[in-house]
């Protein structure tokens, strides 16, 4: 299914309020919130309801190839009807990185919730990890893109 069509379908659905523990908060340039118009909270079940994608890749943080599973970042952003040019990904340790929307459209970046089929603990860089398909392009195998792969993701601000 073309990404734009999927995005339109996701954007057409109202965003439910989380019923479990909030694992991701989106703020900024969004028009479909569930905590007021410009704030959206997701629990793990909400992220699981989005189309799930798997990618196998090497990272600088692990010796072996790992398989990551989660929704595409573009689908998460479509669910809140985002309209910005960049996002700021914020980790549990307050690490912040800016990611241009061009990355999100060009590459199949996911919000990984599983590594090798298992939920990730905080110690394992979870529970959420922005993951690029590093092995799909030599361009992505650089400090610039490795730095954009935010682990222990807790929030996204759309600008």
Ranges and model annotations:
Residues 2-9:
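Bacterial N-terminal signal peptides
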Residues 13-159:
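N-terminal intrinsically disordered, low-complexity segments enriched in P/E/S/T
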